[in-house]
């Protein structure tokens, strides 16, 4: 597959503060995180999008290997935008 770069905006679970015990009222202020991830989409279906930010290309310029992939549930995805990397 030829590499195409995408920006994925998505919501992630958030919580578990590292500041110790907190009041219930303070914990109720915890919101989901807004995330931006960029990479090559290796797979996408109704359940998930598999995004890989680091890829190795073969001699033909096709994606051969990858590292640091993330599977994001589609219900969490806000938008997917292809980036034009050729000017």
Show where each model-derived region lies:
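Conserved RNA-binding domains used in RNP assembly and mRNA/RNA metabolism
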Residues: 1-87
């Amino acid at each position: 597959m030829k590499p195409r770069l995408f920006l994925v905006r998505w919501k992630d679970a958030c919580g578990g503060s590292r500041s110790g015990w907190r009041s219930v009222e303070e914990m109720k202020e915890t919101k989901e995180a807004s995330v931006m991830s960029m990479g090559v989409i290796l797979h996408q279906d109704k359940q998930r999008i598999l995004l890989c930010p680091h890829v190795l290309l073969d001699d033909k310029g096709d994606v051969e290997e990858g590292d640091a992939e993330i599977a994001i549930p589609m219900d969490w995805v806000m938008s997917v935008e292809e980036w034009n990397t050729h000017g």
